[in-house]
Amino acid sequence: MNGNKIRTRFAPSPTGYMHVGNLRTALYAYLIAKHENGDFLLRIEDTDQERQVEGALDIIYNTLKMTGIHHDEGPDIGGPVGPYVQSERKHIYTEYAQKLIDKGEAYYCFCTKERLDMLRENSESLGRPHKYDKHCSHLSKEEIEENLKAGIPFVIRQNNPNKGTTYFEDEIFGKITVDNSELDDMVLIKSDGFPTYNFANVVDDHLMGITHVVRGSEYLSSSPKYNRLYDAFGWDVPKYIHCPPIMKDSHSKLSKRNGDASFQDLLEKGYLKDAILNYIALLGWNPGTTEEIFSLEDLIGKFDYKSINKAPAIFDNKKLKWMNGEYIRMFSLEEFHKLALPYYKGVITKDFDLLKISELLHTRTELLSEIPEQVDFFDELPEYSCDLYVHKKMKTNFENSLESLEKALPVLESIDNWNTETIHDSIMELIKELEVKNGIVLWPIRTAVSGKKFTPGGAFEIAEILGKEETLKRVKIGIEKLKNEINQ
């Protein structure tokens, strides 16, 4: 390892889907490394064996591969500082925990669950934050050996002082100082022999040469304890980059426990991976310009972690949808058509020109999953209310809509060469003859051929795709519906 090289890591737990916050952490860590031609590592933190979910590891690998966040070292490709799975490094943590015990920076704790529960209840009844009372830190060497020999279950705890202060520097939040009296003697090694996240991440970050640690701001409160571990070992502290939380709104955090969208959920809703990644990059960071559309390569060039905000970032679904539309419009018609085809299945079964439908949708689509509801009227005219014919801006009502359709019907019947251009020319000639505004005729025709308030494209384009026979049939249905409505 090059001592001057920036090394970052993404260290997820295989506990389910890839949450938006986790993906942002991976992206920022990747960008920080690649901006300086550094190394980006993948490490799997599976010390909490009970929370592991089958298939979660595949989700991690697939998400990183799909988004182009490629790691230089990791469990699947190896590297000089492996293993890269924490459960395979158990012996390392035990060794380093023993070093802390020898230094007086950690101790064995034999307290039962009942005693710990009682301590917690006492703290709650007094309205104080729960903190272990150092009961086992006073055990003699003989008592400890006796308990170990008897096979009494134990954990290993960090031995934090009660007096003085500890501070740490964060690249985003600056210098943060805490009273040592507030620091709990956190568990380093659990009773099952596995390390806690809090201990393993410090040991691994040092042994793997991590120079910049990217994580959520919820870990700010644990950082003084991490610093005390670094100091106890005599290790250099990496640069801390704590990112602001991603909020659902001004009151609540985006959370997978509350069922908020994961990366997989967003893909299933029809969002594009590049749009998602671009949007996530802007949740807490901005380039200092009004520019908003960035490829991954653009981000590598522009990303500066010093521009990450302290303030929480709001996950704005409308903004993501807008950005997704921008990405869709960057596709060629052929590329968009390929993406749209699966969404036509089951909705369009008749022999329509699907490429022409894609042409209408291309610049009007923001979300791929909305395609079915935009095109379902092609196969079958939906049941619709005559109220659709009434449009304030177009100045249409039942009576003038009926008149327009009755005048348009013979004009449409007379067209031999059925295409958008001829339909357009014929109807525009009619409008000229009638000396009315375009909307007076076009709105009723569009309503009659689609049965919908919103359509991809106007009356002419829809009529061409439907074909002459189906268009005439639908206009006649519209005439009958309006007559019945007026004569009621």
Swiss-Prot record:
Pfam families according to UniProt: Anticodon_2 (PF19269), tRNA-synt_1c (PF00749)
Annotated motif 'KMSKS' region, positions: 253-257
Protein purpose: Catalyzes the attachment of glutamate to tRNA(Glu) in a two-step reaction: glutamate is first activated by ATP to form Glu-AMP and then transferred to the acceptor end of tRNA(Glu).
Annotated positions binding Zn(2+): 109, 111, 136, 138
Binding site for ATP: 256
Broadest EC class assigned to this enzyme: ligase
GO biological process, one term: glutamyl-tRNA aminoacylation
Gene name for this UniProt entry: gltX
Keywords: Aminoacyl-tRNA synthetase, ATP-binding, Cytoplasm, Ligase, Metal-binding, Nucleotide-binding, Protein biosynthesis, Zinc
Annotated protein name in UniProt: Glutamate--tRNA ligase
Cofactor detail note: Binds 1 zinc ion per subunit.
Subcellular location: Cytoplasm
Family of the protein in this entry: Belongs to the class-I aminoacyl-tRNA synthetase family. Glutamate--tRNA ligase type 1 subfamily.
Cofactor list: Zn(2+)
InterPro entries: aa-tRNA-synth_I_cd-bd, aa-tRNA-synth_I_codon-bd_sub2, aa-tRNA-synth_I_CS, aa_tRNA-synth_I_cd-bd_sf, Glu-tRNA-ligase_bac/mito, Glu/Gln-tRNA-synth, Glu/Gln-tRNA-synth_Ib_cat-dom, GluQ/Sye
Record's catalysed reaction(s): tRNA(Glu) + L-glutamate + ATP = L-glutamyl-tRNA(Glu) + AMP + diphosphate
GO CC annotation: cytosol
Enzyme Commission number: 6.1.1.17
CDD domains found in the cross-reference section: GluRS_core
GO molecular function: ATP binding; glutamate-tRNA ligase activity; tRNA binding; zinc ion binding
Subunit-level organization: Monomer.
Top-level taxon of origin: Bacteria
Motif 'HIGH' region, residue numbers: 12-22
